[in-house]
Protein backbone atom coordinates (compact mmCIF):
# COMPACT_ATOMS: atom_id res chain seq x y z
CA UNK A 1 0.00 0.00 0.00
CA UNK A 2 1.28 3.44 -0.90
CA UNK A 3 -0.64 6.36 0.63
CA UNK A 4 1.07 9.72 0.25
CA UNK A 5 0.09 13.36 0.11
CA UNK A 6 2.73 15.57 -1.49
CA UNK A 7 2.11 19.25 -0.87
CA UNK A 8 4.05 22.40 -1.69
CA UNK A 9 2.65 24.48 1.14
CA UNK A 10 0.70 22.17 3.41
CA UNK A 11 -3.06 22.37 3.78
CA UNK A 12 -3.26 25.54 1.70
CA UNK A 13 -6.64 25.15 -0.04
CA UNK A 14 -10.07 23.74 0.86
CA UNK A 15 -9.59 20.97 -1.72
CA UNK A 16 -6.30 19.84 -0.20
CA UNK A 17 -7.82 20.00 3.29
CA UNK A 18 -10.80 17.90 2.19
CA UNK A 19 -8.62 15.21 0.62
CA UNK A 20 -6.36 15.12 3.68
CA UNK A 21 -9.35 14.83 5.99
CA UNK A 22 -10.78 12.00 3.91
CA UNK A 23 -7.48 10.11 4.03
CA UNK A 24 -7.29 10.64 7.80
CA UNK A 25 -10.87 9.48 8.37
CA UNK A 26 -10.66 6.45 6.07
CA UNK A 27 -7.48 5.27 7.78
CA UNK A 28 -8.79 6.00 11.29
CA UNK A 29 -5.79 8.15 12.22
CA UNK A 30 -5.50 8.97 15.93
CA UNK A 31 -1.78 9.75 16.38
CA UNK A 32 0.36 11.87 14.07
CA UNK A 33 4.05 12.75 14.19
CA UNK A 34 5.62 15.79 12.55
CA UNK A 35 9.32 15.35 11.75
CA UNK A 36 10.82 18.71 12.69
CA UNK A 37 14.42 18.12 11.55
CA UNK A 38 14.12 20.19 8.37
CA UNK A 39 14.59 23.51 10.18
CA UNK A 40 18.08 23.19 11.73
CA UNK A 41 17.75 25.94 14.34
CA UNK A 42 14.06 26.54 14.95
CA UNK A 43 12.94 22.89 14.79
CA UNK A 44 9.39 22.55 16.19
CA UNK A 45 9.37 26.24 17.19
CA UNK A 46 9.22 27.29 13.54
CA UNK A 47 5.83 28.89 12.74
CA UNK A 48 5.26 26.40 9.92
CA UNK A 49 5.69 23.49 12.35
CA UNK A 50 3.18 24.96 14.75
CA UNK A 51 0.71 25.69 11.94
CA UNK A 52 0.80 22.09 10.71
CA UNK A 53 0.21 20.85 14.25
CA UNK A 54 -2.84 23.11 14.55
CA UNK A 55 -4.09 21.93 11.17
CA UNK A 56 -3.78 18.26 12.07
CA UNK A 57 -5.48 18.76 15.42
CA UNK A 58 -8.33 20.55 13.63
CA UNK A 59 -8.80 17.37 11.57
CA UNK A 60 -9.75 15.54 14.76
CA UNK A 61 -6.45 13.75 15.24
CA UNK A 62 -6.26 13.15 18.98
CA UNK A 63 -2.49 13.37 19.41
CA UNK A 64 0.07 15.31 17.35
CA UNK A 65 3.73 15.21 18.41
CA UNK A 66 7.04 16.44 17.04
CA UNK A 67 10.09 14.24 16.51
CA UNK A 68 13.56 15.48 15.59
CA UNK A 69 15.46 12.52 14.16
CA UNK A 70 18.73 14.46 14.40
CA UNK A 71 18.65 13.99 18.17
CA UNK A 72 15.78 11.60 18.97
CA UNK A 73 15.23 7.88 18.39
CA UNK A 74 13.70 7.39 14.95
CA UNK A 75 12.11 4.13 16.11
CA UNK A 76 9.49 6.27 17.87
CA UNK A 77 7.98 6.79 14.42
CA UNK A 78 6.49 3.31 14.68
CA UNK A 79 4.18 4.62 17.43
CA UNK A 80 2.20 6.76 14.96
CA UNK A 81 -0.21 6.09 12.12
CA UNK A 82 0.50 9.31 10.20
CA UNK A 83 3.93 10.80 9.58
CA UNK A 84 4.26 14.40 8.36
CA UNK A 85 7.59 15.39 6.79
CA UNK A 86 7.67 19.15 7.09
CA UNK A 87 9.33 21.71 4.87
CA UNK A 88 12.66 23.45 5.31
CA UNK A 89 16.06 22.38 4.00
CA UNK A 90 15.91 19.19 1.90
CA UNK A 91 19.63 18.39 2.14
CA UNK A 92 19.61 18.77 5.93
CA UNK A 93 16.42 16.75 6.30
CA UNK A 94 17.53 13.89 4.06
CA UNK A 95 20.98 13.74 5.67
CA UNK A 96 19.56 13.10 9.13
CA UNK A 97 16.71 10.92 7.88
CA UNK A 98 19.39 8.58 6.53
CA UNK A 99 21.87 8.97 9.39
CA UNK A 100 19.20 8.15 11.98
CA UNK A 101 17.88 5.14 10.07
CA UNK A 102 14.53 6.87 9.66
CA UNK A 103 14.72 6.20 5.92
CA UNK A 104 14.34 2.45 6.45
CA UNK A 105 11.70 3.00 9.12
CA UNK A 106 9.64 5.24 6.83
CA UNK A 107 9.87 2.65 4.07
CA UNK A 108 8.49 0.00 6.42
CA UNK A 109 5.75 2.35 7.60
CA UNK A 110 4.85 3.01 3.98
CA UNK A 111 4.79 -0.71 3.17
CA UNK A 112 2.45 -1.24 6.12
CA UNK A 113 -0.04 1.13 4.51
CA UNK A 114 0.32 4.00 6.98
CA UNK A 115 -0.10 7.59 5.79
CA UNK A 116 2.88 9.82 5.01
CA UNK A 117 2.34 13.49 4.15
CA UNK A 118 5.03 15.84 2.85
CA UNK A 119 5.40 19.61 2.63
CA UNK A 120 7.96 21.15 0.27
CA UNK A 121 11.30 19.60 1.33
CA UNK A 122 9.35 16.72 2.84
CA UNK A 123 7.63 16.07 -0.49
CA UNK A 124 10.94 16.30 -2.35
CA UNK A 125 12.74 13.63 -0.31
CA UNK A 126 9.82 11.19 -0.64
CA UNK A 127 10.72 10.91 -4.33
CA UNK A 128 13.56 9.07 -6.06
CA UNK A 129 16.24 11.75 -5.71
CA UNK A 130 17.07 15.30 -4.69
CA UNK A 131 19.51 15.67 -7.59
CA UNK A 132 17.49 18.60 -8.95
CA UNK A 133 18.20 20.46 -5.70
CA UNK A 134 21.92 19.78 -6.17
CA UNK A 135 21.64 21.09 -9.73
CA UNK A 136 19.83 24.27 -8.69
CA UNK A 137 21.15 24.95 -5.19
CA UNK A 138 24.51 23.18 -4.67
CA UNK A 139 25.40 25.68 -1.96
CA UNK A 140 22.68 24.20 0.26
CA UNK A 141 24.42 20.81 0.39
CA UNK A 142 26.27 21.71 3.57
CA UNK A 143 27.35 18.13 4.29
CA UNK A 144 28.64 17.63 0.73
CA UNK A 145 26.57 14.46 0.50
CA UNK A 146 27.21 12.59 -2.74
CA UNK A 147 24.34 10.12 -2.32
CA UNK A 148 21.33 12.14 -3.39
CA UNK A 149 18.87 9.24 -3.44
CA UNK A 150 15.53 10.06 -1.86
CA UNK A 151 13.26 7.65 0.00
CA UNK A 152 11.84 6.52 -3.35
CA UNK A 153 8.34 5.99 -1.99
CA UNK A 154 7.06 7.49 -5.23
CA UNK A 155 8.49 7.98 -8.71
CA UNK A 156 7.40 11.63 -8.64
CA UNK A 157 10.15 14.28 -8.67
CA UNK A 158 8.63 17.37 -7.05
CA UNK A 159 9.72 20.97 -7.38
CA UNK A 160 7.56 22.99 -4.92
CA UNK A 161 6.64 26.69 -4.97
CA UNK A 162 7.18 26.86 -8.74
CA UNK A 163 4.96 29.86 -9.52
CA UNK A 164 6.11 31.62 -6.37
CA UNK A 165 9.79 31.04 -7.18
CA UNK A 166 9.35 32.49 -10.66
CA UNK A 167 8.68 35.89 -9.11
CA UNK A 168 12.01 35.66 -7.25
CA UNK A 169 14.06 33.98 -9.97
CA UNK A 170 12.60 34.24 -13.50
CA UNK A 171 15.37 31.93 -14.79
CA UNK A 172 14.11 28.97 -12.74
CA UNK A 173 11.79 27.84 -15.54
CA UNK A 174 14.67 27.55 -18.03
CA UNK A 175 16.92 25.89 -15.45
CA UNK A 176 14.39 23.16 -14.73
CA UNK A 177 13.69 22.68 -18.45
CA UNK A 178 17.42 22.29 -19.04
CA UNK A 179 17.69 19.74 -16.23
CA UNK A 180 14.82 17.73 -17.73
CA UNK A 181 16.44 17.78 -21.17
CA UNK A 182 19.83 16.73 -19.81
CA UNK A 183 18.57 13.93 -17.56
CA UNK A 184 15.35 12.75 -19.18
CA UNK A 185 13.67 13.13 -15.78
CA UNK A 186 10.21 14.68 -15.63
CA UNK A 187 9.82 17.27 -12.87
CA UNK A 188 6.38 17.86 -11.36
CA UNK A 189 6.11 21.56 -10.64
CA UNK A 190 3.82 22.30 -7.72
CA UNK A 191 2.56 25.76 -6.85
CA UNK A 192 1.66 26.63 -3.28
CA UNK A 193 -2.00 25.95 -3.95
CA UNK A 194 -1.37 22.47 -5.37
CA UNK A 195 -0.71 18.98 -4.05
CA UNK A 196 -0.51 15.39 -5.28
CA UNK A 197 -2.44 12.56 -3.66
CA UNK A 198 -0.88 9.13 -4.24
CA UNK A 199 -2.85 5.95 -3.65
CA UNK A 200 -0.81 2.98 -4.85
CA UNK A 201 -0.38 3.59 -8.60
CA UNK A 202 -3.01 6.34 -8.78
CA UNK A 203 -1.78 9.93 -8.70
CA UNK A 204 -4.25 12.80 -8.42
CA UNK A 205 -3.32 16.45 -8.85
CA UNK A 206 -5.18 18.69 -6.43
CA UNK A 207 -5.47 22.24 -7.76
Listing of model-derived features with the role each one plays in the protein:
Residues 1-82:
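N-terminal beta1-alpha1 cap of cysteine-dependent amidohydrolase-like domains
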Residues 5-6, 82-86, 117-118, 157-158:
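Structural motif
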Residues 15-17, 44, 94-96, 126-129, ...:
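Short glycine-/acidic-enriched loop or helix-start segments at secondary-structure transitions
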Residues 47-51, 97-104, 172-173:
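Charged helix-capping and loop-helix junction motifs
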Residues 65-114:
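Flexible gly/pro-rich beta->alpha loop and the following alpha-helix that scaffold active-site loops
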Residues 95-96, 103-164:
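Class I SAM-dependent methyltransferase SAM-binding "motif I" and its flanking Rossmann-like core
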Residues 149-193, 199:
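Conserved anion/nucleotide-ligand pocket segment
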Residues 197-202, 207:
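Short acidic-glycine loop/turn motifs at beta-strand connectors
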